[in-house]
Amino acid sequence: MAFARFARPTQRFLPFAIGAVAVTAGALYLNGWNTIKNENPKVFIGDRKWIDLELEKIIEESHDTKRFFFKLPTDDSVSGLTLASAVLTKFMTPKGNPVIRPYTPVSDLSEKGYIEFVIKHYEGGKMTDHLFQLKPKDTLAFQGPIPKWQWKPNSFDTITLLGGGTGITPLYQLVHHITQNKEDKTKINLFYGSKTPSDILLKKELDDLQKKYPEQLNIQYFVDKDDTGKFDGNKGFITKDFLAKNAPGPKEKTQVFVCGPPPFMDSLSGQKKSPMEQGDLTGALKDLGYSQDQVFKF
């Protein structure tokens, strides 16, 4: 077999050869750099590392609830969270003991530069006691994401979301994401219970979404008592009879999501067995004939 012989480049061509390589390498580098720049850096990537985020501002939501805005590392950073996922927060007590709690953000998943939470203060709650004494520029440790439910558009004809108190946060995340996706035709029933009209969290955002997507989103509020004299929603609790009349039945292509305080969960679905285990389905939803797989507890 004959092999071709290649002449060694003469000295006078070397600068041009080197220059061509440099230009090509530079073009590849810049192209790669532009590609990297176009991808917003994700903060929470599941590496189990704690990252300190600075508190940017606090806004009063109600008499016992606040919105907390934490700055991400850069203005172009995004959280990296997936739909219906949460993060862990942590601080150390004076005795050196860690206090860790999960929270679901309410900011858009693609929001750049910050992450937002709506958090209620619980008397004697170690984390909320700590959070409610924070001031802008203080930091808090975060880790995530904690995946909850992998949402797939158009998997169900209609979903029913049952929320109580601050349990609205993961449900709001679902509502917001589904309505923003023009390809997702899933219809949504949101039944949300609070102590009083003043305790209804994210009401402006929810009402705006209902006005914008009236054919897709149906919201009904429930309160224990009316402290305004102007409330025109439902008074009392979300009951089995109400669900039987207003939610798709278990024989339909549907899914139910539930999130709220222990008494709320006990009444409708039963509590989770542990943070990672759903536990047995009980309460009103079981009585109505829903299967374990048709109900998800946040």
Curated annotation (Swiss-Prot):
GO terms for biological process: ergosterol biosynthetic process. Residues 48-152 form the FAD-binding FR-type domain. It comes from the Eukaryota. It holds the Pfam family FAD_binding_6. GO terms for molecular function: cytochrome-b5 reductase activity, acting on NAD(P)H. It catalyses: 2 Fe(III)-[cytochrome b5] + NADH = 2 Fe(II)-[cytochrome b5] + NAD(+) + H(+). The keyword Membrane applies. FAD binds at residues 155-190. InterPro entries: CBR-like, Cbr1-like_FAD-bd_dom, FAD-bd_FR_type, Flavoprot_Pyr_Nucl_cyt_Rdtase, FNR_nucleotide-bd, OxRdtase_FAD/NAD-bd, Riboflavin_synthase-like_b-brl. It is a single-pass membrane protein. May mediate the reduction of outer membrane cytochrome b5. This is NADH-cytochrome b5 reductase 2. The gene is MCR1.
